[in-house]
């Protein structure tokens, strides 16, 4: 491989919104850091991961879409006439 043309590929911690963390490698190196297994690593925050996604956990979660629609209609005065 040629030197100087490839991005750095370092260890980072990915953390989902549920607080689950896992260590992997990435070319994206953020400034924010966290401690994982006693060492300091850069951290990338993600919404969901394989530890929290319903497909991988087998949990069913109900999303309140009806409440969201009502909130939208109320916000823009689109209620029933």
From Swiss-Prot:
SUPFAM superfamilies named among the record's database cross-references: L28p-like (SSF143800)
Presence of the UniProt keyword Transmembrane in the record: no
One cellular component term from this protein's GO annotations in UniProt: ribosome
MF terms in GO: rRNA binding; structural constituent of ribosome
Gene3D superfamilies membership: Ribosomal protein L31
Protein keywords: Ribonucleoprotein, Ribosomal protein, RNA-binding, rRNA-binding
Organism domain of life: Bacteria
PANTHER family xref list: 50S RIBOSOMAL PROTEIN L31, CHLOROPLASTIC, LARGE RIBOSOMAL SUBUNIT PROTEIN BL31C
The family this protein is said to belong to: Belongs to the bacterial ribosomal protein bL31 family. Type A subfamily.
Summary of the function given for this chain in its UniProt record: Binds the 23S rRNA.
Protein name: Large ribosomal subunit protein bL31
Native source species: Fusobacterium nucleatum subsp. nucleatum (strain ATCC 25586 / DSM 15643 / BCRC 10681 / CIP 101130 / JCM 8532 / KCTC 2640 / LMG 13131 / VPI 4355)
Phylogenetic classification of the source organism: Bacteria, Fusobacteriati, Fusobacteriota, Fusobacteriia, Fusobacteriales
Gene: rpmE
